[in-house]
Amino acid sequence: MKNIVVSMQNTLLSEAIAHALTETREFRVEQILPGRTGDALSLCAAMPADILLMEVSRLSAYTLESRLSLIDRLSAKIPGCKFALLCDENSDPELARQVVCARQDRRIDAFLYA
């Protein structure tokens, strides 16, 4: 069973993703409450997380820069953890392009469009 930490601004989307992953019985999912993005480091280290799925947006706690900074810190603590970013390519095409670049630069393992 894989441990996944989900950190999203949109609570409804976070709940839906967590529910879908849990139903497969292949994943144990922990969610970080909106606005509590600082909890990601300690929660991922405590589990330890196999995958960290995070939403990126223009809001300060969810920016690509802050997410990549967290990934850099977590990579040192949990070398086997995989990182996936979720973004809305329709409402912010430039942010979506930056996420694709982060994948091409191998700073993240995967990205998803919402």
Regions found by a protein language model. Give the residues of each.
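Two-component/phosphorelay signaling modules centered on CheY-like receiver
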Residues: 11-33, 37
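Active-site charged/polar residues at nucleotide-handling catalytic sites that mediate phosphoryl
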Residues: 46-47, 106
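Non-catalytic signal-transmission and effector/linker regions of two-component phosphorelay proteins
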Residues: 1-4, 13
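Short, aromatic/basic amphipathic alpha-helical patches
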Residues: 16-21, 69-73, 95-104
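Conserved phosphotransfer microenvironments
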Residues: 37-40, 50-77, 87-90, 95
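Conserved acidic carboxylate
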Residues: 7-8
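Output/docking surface of receiver
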Residues: 87-114
